[in-house]
Structure formats: structure tokens, C-alpha cells
Amino acid sequence: MENVYISSYSSNEQTSMAVAATNIRELLSQYVDDANLEDLIEWAMEKSSKYYIKNIGNTKSNIEETKFESKNNIGIEYSKDSRNKLSYRNKPFIATNLEYKTLCDMIKGTSGTEKEFLRYLLFGIKCIKKGVEYNIDKIKDVSYNDYFNVLNEKYNTPCPNCKSRNTTPMMIQTRAADEPPLVRHACRDCKQHFKPPKFRAFRNLNVTTQSIHKNKEITEILPDNNPSPPESPEPASPIDDGLIRVTFDRNDEPPEDDE
């Protein structure tokens, strides 16, 4: 059986001598079978080099401990480096799984891309143990097109400017619970915004005729025998009520007093 080392799968980064001397194949054969071994190593090397997160050299000057209670403090610390703000990382004193103690100890004693490689291996081993696909590229996303056709051009609202159905509804502003939100549609072709269509108010002749016919029947069954309301009296003259006063000019003679 050919020996497989981390250095044989890394073309850009050179691993340390301690990890390079470790037979990774023999270590992984304790957890997974040979059928999944090659794919797991290849996947771990690809993802660790692609999604490698650079570890920051934390010192006392840029490290601040968490202010949580002791029972809730899981040992998270973050770096206040100006280039990498709030870069969270876990401290190595967190209790690890005893089943993978050998691999966990190797992760604690390494750094850089080799540490990321071992972490991906540990994740893949746990997924294989549970019968779950570890490679996210092979997981098929669920398609809900049969249930929701909101963004389907067949059902979209046509644009009044260019008559295209390549439109998207957007909620511009949310209001109170008893008020409708402000919704606008955006056309991707002509880059115009327009209001959503409204329902037109129309009369249903069948319902109106039926309601009138029903009212006639009710009138015939229960006739209105109440007396008619009295006629409204004529409004009083404002002059008689004294609301309007007779005015005269100063040059005119004063009005005669009534005897």
C-alpha cells in the first residue's frame, strides 16, 4: 500500500515535518473504509486550500477576553487587528471528542493549511459515520418551482413601459399591521419602476337584480305603513330674527322712530 502524506497533496504550501511524517492513510483507515478514503483526502485538500482562513498572530495587545459569565464562556476570543476586525477563533482548551482524540491532537499541534486540512478530514469522517454527504457540491438543492412561481415570467406583472414580463416585486416600505405595505415592481429590461395593478370596482348585475327582487318581496310581505315625515318648514328670514341690521350712511337722515 502506497503511503500518503499531506505534502504529496499540497502543491503551494509545505507542511511541517511532524505532520508530513504521519501516515494519513493509516490514521483515516481507523475511521473510514478504503472506498471513501481517496475521495475524502482529495476533497479535504481542495477545500482547505480554497477556503483557508489566515490565522492571526494574536498577542496581549490585540486580544480581549469575552465578558460572558463563566458558565457561558466557551472560550471565544477575537482579534482587534485593523485589517481583520472581529476575527473570532476558538481556544484549544475546549473539550474534544475522545473518539477522534488522535486527530484532534494533531489539529491542536498544527497551524496554517495543514490544520485546515485536518479539520476538513475530521468533518468528513463525522459525516461518513452518520451517513451524510460531506461534499456540499454533490448535494442537490430542493426545487420549489412547482409550488411557487413568483418570479416566473409567465406569471409576472407586465411592465407598462416596455410590456416585458421580466419584472420583480419589491417591498419598499413596511407599515403598521393594519396598513398594506408599499410595494413597487421593477422591470429588469427598461429599468423602470411602476405601481402594482389594482382591482377595478364593477357592479355584478346578477347580484344587484337579485337584491332588488329580494327587497321587493320583503316590501310586499312587510309593507311600510308608517306615516310620512312632516314637511320641512320654510327657513326664517334673517331680517325678522334680527340677524341682519339695517345700516344707513351718516349723511342720510336717521330713520323715524315708530310711534
Swiss-Prot record:
<protein>
    <recommendedName>
        <fullName>DNA-directed RNA polymerase 30 kDa polypeptide</fullName>
        <ecNumber>2.7.7.6</ecNumber>
    </recommendedName>
</protein>
<dbReference type="InterPro" id="IPR009162">
    <property type="entry name" value="RNA_pol_30_chordopoxvir-type"/>
</dbReference>
<dbReference type="GO" id="GO:0006351">
    <property type="term" value="P:DNA-templated transcription"/>
</dbReference>
<comment type="function">
    <text>Part of the DNA-dependent RNA polymerase which catalyzes the transcription of viral DNA into RNA using the four ribonucleoside triphosphates as substrates. Responsible for the transcription of early, intermediate and late genes. DNA-dependent RNA polymerase associates with the early transcription factor (ETF), itself composed of OPG118 and OPG134, thereby allowing the early genes transcription. Late transcription, and probably also intermediate transcription, require newly synthesized RNA polymerase.</text>
</comment>
<keyword id="KW-0804">Transcription</keyword>
<feature type="binding site">
    <location>
        <position position="187"/>
    </location>
    <ligand>
        <name>Zn(2+)</name>
    </ligand>
</feature>
<dbReference type="GO" id="GO:0030430">
    <property type="term" value="C:host cell cytoplasm"/>
</dbReference>
<feature type="zinc finger region" description="TFIIS-type">
    <location>
        <begin position="155"/>
        <end position="195"/>
    </location>
</feature>
<dbReference type="InterPro" id="IPR024394">
    <property type="entry name" value="RNA_pol_30_chordopoxvir-type_N"/>
</dbReference>
<keyword id="KW-0240">DNA-directed RNA polymerase</keyword>
<comment type="similarity">
    <text>Belongs to the poxviridae DNA-directed RNA polymerase 30 kDa subunit family.</text>
</comment>
<feature type="binding site">
    <location>
        <position position="162"/>
    </location>
    <ligand>
        <name>Zn(2+)</name>
    </ligand>
</feature>
<keyword id="KW-0479">Metal-binding</keyword>
<dbReference type="Pfam" id="PF01096">
    <property type="entry name" value="Zn_ribbon_TFIIS"/>
</dbReference>
<keyword id="KW-0946">Virion</keyword>
<keyword id="KW-0863">Zinc-finger</keyword>
<keyword id="KW-0808">Transferase</keyword>
<comment type="subunit">
    <text>The DNA-dependent RNA polymerase (vRNAP) consists of eight subunits encoded by early viral genes and termed according to their apparent molecular masses Rpo147, Rpo132, Rpo35, Rpo30, Rpo22, Rpo19, Rpo18, and Rpo7. The same holoenzyme, with the addition of the transcription-specificity factor RAP94, is used for early gene expression.</text>
</comment>
<keyword id="KW-0548">Nucleotidyltransferase</keyword>
<dbReference type="GO" id="GO:0000428">
    <property type="term" value="C:DNA-directed RNA polymerase complex"/>
</dbReference>
<feature type="region of interest" description="Disordered">
    <location>
        <begin position="220"/>
        <end position="259"/>
    </location>
</feature>
<keyword id="KW-0862">Zinc</keyword>
<feature type="compositionally biased region" description="Pro residues">
    <location>
        <begin position="226"/>
        <end position="236"/>
    </location>
</feature>
<keyword id="KW-0244">Early protein</keyword>
<dbReference type="GO" id="GO:0008270">
    <property type="term" value="F:zinc ion binding"/>
</dbReference>
<dbReference type="GO" id="GO:0003899">
    <property type="term" value="F:DNA-directed RNA polymerase activity"/>
</dbReference>
<feature type="binding site">
    <location>
        <position position="159"/>
    </location>
    <ligand>
        <name>Zn(2+)</name>
    </ligand>
</feature>
<dbReference type="GO" id="GO:0044423">
    <property type="term" value="C:virion component"/>
</dbReference>
<dbReference type="InterPro" id="IPR001222">
    <property type="entry name" value="Znf_TFIIS"/>
</dbReference>
<dbReference type="GO" id="GO:0003677">
    <property type="term" value="F:DNA binding"/>
</dbReference>
<feature type="binding site">
    <location>
        <position position="190"/>
    </location>
    <ligand>
        <name>Zn(2+)</name>
    </ligand>
</feature>
<dbReference type="Pfam" id="PF12410">
    <property type="entry name" value="rpo30_N"/>
</dbReference>
<keyword id="KW-1035">Host cytoplasm</keyword>
